[in-house]
């Protein structure tokens, strides 16, 4: 056992200083700095990847810098270094936003402006039109900052608790924070008022939703939209079928009504014909009295002649 302990102790790197320093090294790990062949061109032409704390060019502040864009120092106007009171710099100095009026050449404050008068892509103000409407008519030519809506995703509860199984594939945002070493060791005496670092929030697994990878939410939303469209199409088809059935029933009803009207008209015409025939005999009876009946009997042989008094004159008389 003693030999094993000695071996474990010797396996630690020299100058580690114990587990606490190892944890500090892991949490404060910095990526190596890479230099490419085109890095000087980017720094010289676009002032790219230059340190933000580099000194200010005094020659440019006085009005003329012979190096111009090749100068390794910062070229800032006097408005970026405004002072207030006893020489204290404004909170808006180099860490503030670029003046939106200066971008258009319309800033009236000049050197007294509390915003930056320099073209710095990292300090550009946010485009209000893009924030309100989700798009900007100026497109890529807009001078203001267009923030991707995906960057406003809610924080990942699994990552805040300490670990997210999906890693960079998670559809929620992962905010990197410096952990409190005391809390990581097991106890922080300052509690919620700790200023040494973040305290990961612990939430029970049953109270947390399952993490989803990027694109899964869009697929679920697409499936729901497809189901809604299918239901809508089915409803439209049922509505068309019901409308056709109603139209067919209405046509059949109209046909039956037409047939009924036709039968009624034929029946009325037959009744009118019968009434007309019966009405002729009645007229003869009324006009000729009782002799009409006898004449009717003798009409079969000779018929009647004339409309005189005596009635009929046939062959039998």
Curated annotation (Swiss-Prot):
SMART domains in the cross-refs: ZnF_C3H1
Keyword match Flavoprotein: no
Gene Ontology biological-process annotations: mRNA processing
GO MF assignments: RNA binding; zinc ion binding
Chief place of localization: nucleus
Positions with biased composition (Basic and acidic residues): 202-217, 253-288
Zinc fingers typed C3H1-type, residue spans: 51-78, 93-120, 121-149, 150-177, 179-202
Entry-linked Pfam families: zf-CCCH, zf-CCCH_2
PROSITE patterns, per database record: ZF_C3H1
Compartment(s): Nucleus
Name of the molecule in the record: mRNA 3'-end-processing protein yth-1
Organism expressing this protein natively: Neurospora crassa (strain ATCC 24698 / 74-OR23-1A / CBS 708.71 / DSM 1257 / FGSC 987)
Gene: yth-1
